[in-house]
A protein has these predicted regions:
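Class I SAM-dependent methyltransferase SAM/SAH-binding core
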Residues: 43-45, 49-99, 124
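A short glycine-rich, Lys/Arg-flanked "PGG" loop and its adjoining helix->strand segment in the class I
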Residues: 123-138
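A short acidic, Gly/Pro-enriched loop at the edge of an enzyme's catalytic core
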Residues: 100-109
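C-terminal helical/coil "lid" or tail adjacent to the Rossmann-like core of SAM-dependent
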Residues: 4, 13-14, 198-255
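Helix-to-beta-strand junctions that scaffold the AdoMet/dcAdoMet cofactor pocket
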Residues: 61, 118-119, 133-135
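Conserved alpha-helix/loop element of class I SAM-dependent methyltransferases that forms part
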Residues: 21-38, 55
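Class I SAM-dependent methyltransferase Rossmann-like catalytic core
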Residues: 2-25
């Protein structure tokens, strides 16, 4: 079976996971770094639950608007139900790999935590979405580097399984744990001007574990492990023991986990 075109995290609770994990304050800070402000028309590509679209829409008031697009009917339905009454917002069922001209043109195109699911095809997606960006408009790419890989302290056997699981997701499900480091080069190669790069922490987990982080990380583990259960065969006790051991480590306030977020923005030539 060809799994490269499948979304790694696809499951009935994905809209909820995305909604729970999205921090409006972090979105605002990141959008300010990209220059998003009042009066702009913004495309939120891969909008998921619509929560980020709603934050962006709030930031472009007065006079602005935001359009969120996603290829999953259930997520667009969730977004419309939860955030569709926000003035200036709309949601559409569309694939970022397909023509987007029907949406019109935008001052900003925002692509956050999408390219990590496109080890193959990320650059082509960026090129496609840039076609609806106005001349002089800015594209905003935001993604993680070393995604899910940085935990301390952790036993070598557990770390080995995590790395093997991530490799399997790369090989079979088009996942890219190093998407962040590639964003600048995407824009450079596509001829964008005035490229700016910012590096900030995203996952920065220490001390007591937040309920939202617990839900997000164990939903990730559940989804990835369901696609590669054999990866756990070499771990003493198999998957169930690994899950129990990882929960014990991850819930301990001594644990330190982080993932860097790379933000790259560039101006489309006039």
């Amino acid at each position: 079976m060809d799994t490269v075109g499948q979304y790694l995290m696809e499951n009935p609770e994905e809209a909820l996971r995305l909604d729970v994990k999205t921090d409006p304050g972090a979105v605002r800070s990141q959008a300010l770094l990209c220059g998003i402000g009042p009066g702009a028309r913004v495309l939120d590509g891969g909008c998921g639950s619509g929560k980020t679209t709603a934050v962006l829409c709030e930031m472009v008031q007065p006079g602005g608007s935001a359009v969120g697009v996603d290829f999953a009917e259930d997520r667009v339905r969730f977004a419309k139900k939860t955030y569709g009454d926000t003035p200036g917002i709309e949601f559409a069922l569309m694939d970022l790999r397909s023509p987007l001209n029907a949406l019109g043109s935008f001052d900003f195109v925002w692509i956050r935590f999408v390219l990590e699911y496109y080890l193959e095809g990320a650059r082509e997606m960026v090129e496609n979405v840039s076609r609806v960006l106005k001349p002089g408009g800015r594209i905003c790419l935001l993604d993680l580097d070393y995604n899910c890989l940085n935990h301390y302290p952790i036993e070598p056997a557990m770390e080995s399984v995590i790395h093997a699981l991530v490799r399997r997701m790369m090989e079979k499900y088009n996942f890219d744990p190093y998407a962040g480091r590639k964003l600048y080069t995407h824009l450079y190669d596509l001829g964008f001007d005035d490229i700016e790069v910012h590096l900030v922490p995203h996952h920065l987990i220490y001390g007591e574990l937040k309920e939202s982080d617990d839900f997000n990380w164990f939903k990730k583990l559940e989804m990835a492990s369901s696609k590669a259960r054999d990866v756990f065969d070499g771990y003493p006790g198999g998957y169930e023991t690994f899950r129990k051991d990882f929960r014990q480590v991850f819930n301990h306030p001594r644990r330190f986990t982080y993932s860097p977020l790379i933000i790259v923005t560039g101006r489309k030539p006039s």
